[in-house]
Amino acid sequence: MKNVITAPKIGQSVFIPFVTKTDELTGKTERIKGAALIPFDTIDAVYAENERSNNGKTVFSVRVKSGDVVKVVQRNEKWEAVL
């Protein structure tokens, strides 16, 4: 039987498979796929608002220890950041 988790909790681990950087000239945030130096981070805060993905999964907004706010979805009983 699978362990069902309905919402992320503070202290849980999040897999972040990408790094974002801000271009100094344009000010736009760019995604660098597969370049995460530390691909795992810990949830520091969970925000109340959530969304639905195209396939019906709930997407939660969380802040991780590094200070970034990312959206996470549950995949294979673990939390993974998505864009």
From Swiss-Prot:
Q: Name one Pfam family in it.
A: DUF7177
Question: Which protein, by its recorded name, is this?
Answer: Uncharacterized 9.2 kDa protein
Could you tell me the superkingdom of the organism this chain comes from? Viruses
**What InterPro entries is this protein classified in?**
DUF7177
